[in-house]
Amino acid sequence: MAQILAPSVQWQMRFTKNSTEVSSMTSKMWGSLFLKQNKKAPARSSTKYRALAVKSEDGTINRMEDLLNLDVTPYTDKIIAEYIWIGGTGIDVRSKSRTISKPVEHPSELPKWNYDGSSTGQAPGDDSEVILYPQAIFKDPFRGGNNILVICDTYTPQGEPIPTNKRHKAAQIFSDAKVLGEVPWFGIEQEYTLMQQDVNWPLGWNVGGYPGPQGPYYCAAGADKSFGRDISDAHYKACLYAGINISGTNGEVMPGQWEFQVGPSVGIEAGDHIWCARYLLERITEQAGVVLTLDPKPIDGDWNGAGCHTNYSTKSMREEGGFEVIKKAILNLSLRHKEHISAYGEGNERRLTGKHETASIDSFSWGVADRGCSIRVGRDTEKEGKGYLEDRRPASNMDPYVVTGLLAETTLLWEPTLEAEALAAQKLSLNV
């Protein structure tokens, strides 16, 4: 198991004088040299790696790399569990580690934990304890072995969900018998922008300057068109290793902007997987010395914003005659447009302008193959008479628990009045 290595920002790689000298490793390059680890102790996993220790310019061995990549699996049953939760802004991810006595397979085997909520904006100083409830487990691509990442949600000591715990309500929605019977699928397209550290300007752009107009950068290759591919690829592999249901990646329309897709995932799993994928991306950009932003419009002007398009279907939508079910769902979504917009991410009004492949934030629309609509239906869905819809309104900084839960609630549990339904159907030219 090869771990993702950070670019080395504190040392340069050179061989000693009696060997061939190679060019130095800068902070923008990945330290990607590995040797298979030969241990005399009995191995508990099939493949192990360690970083190649090289001499720095002063001749000292970089022991930290050896320790960071040390696989302790052959020597102890204990594992490291990284407890991850969402902080006080509703978009920041926090984590801390603890030792668990043996490998686990289910969150119920893990203990609850606590943290200082006054330091994350989630509790007052005189009553600062917030309790972490383990909810989902993923393999840890940084530590390897049997070590794990644990997605948690947050509660008061009395067992009440705190205000930033959006998972709790989503879990209630997805536990409803009607929702369970419809087996809701979600495919989430997470866009993000990579920024140069300390200058708050996109990766690959001259500081304070602008590249050529949009057009050459989407899904492009080349040093003058693609910036940050190493980060995107490292993240892709880390997600696959972790067990995240990642389904693809691509470079986006604005240079320095990327996207990854997660799904199809069922119910609450969609939110768990997106949050874990975001955590991995934060860790990888941290190692790379690059800043990750989920701002929906990081650069003003004639540049695309960053969204989190959410593809959605139910069992009824995927079966014969499903297009009629999709149209009924679109009708319901139109009637709750304001409720959805208010929950679809902060600063989304800067992105949803009606330009740059977006609909206006003030009006609801739908169309087939139209990326300027609120809800897009694909050509294949129209042709086959069944499939899914794409909600193009969510911003890149949306909470996936909120968005997925709201989609299920509006389309499966909420019923409009007959009068409102008729008026909306007429306005949207929907015969339902």
From Swiss-Prot:
Places the protein is found: Plastid, Chloroplast
GS catalytic domain sequence ranges: 166-432
Keywords associated with the record: ATP-binding, Chloroplast, Ligase, Nucleotide-binding, Plastid, Transit peptide
Broad class of where this protein is predominantly found: plastid
EC numbers on record: 6.3.1.2
Annotated catalysed reactions: L-glutamate + NH4(+) + ATP = L-glutamine + ADP + phosphate + H(+)
GO cellular component, one term: chloroplast
GS beta-grasp domain: residues covered: 79-159
Keyword hit for Transit peptide: yes
An example Gene Ontology biological process: glutamine biosynthetic process
Domain of life, per lineage: Eukaryota
EC class name: ligase
PROSITE patterns assigned: GLNA_1, GLNA_ATP, GS_BETA_GRASP, GS_CATALYTIC
Pfam families attached to this UniProt entry: Gln-synt_C (PF00120), Gln-synt_N (PF03951)
GO molecular function: ATP binding; glutamine synthetase activity
InterPro entries found in the cross-reference section: Gln_synt_N, Gln_synt_N_sf, Gln_synth/guanido_kin_cat_dom, Gln_synth_cat_dom, Gln_synth_gly_rich_site, Gln_synth_N_conserv_site, Glutamine_Synthetase
Subunit architecture: Homooctamer.
Function: The light-modulated chloroplast enzyme, encoded by a nuclear gene and expressed primarily in leaves, is responsible for the reassimilation of the ammonia generated by photorespiration.
Homology family: Belongs to the glutamine synthetase family.
UniProt protein name: Glutamine synthetase, chloroplastic
Lineage: Eukaryota, Viridiplantae, Streptophyta, Embryophyta, Tracheophyta
Gene from which the chain derives: GLN2
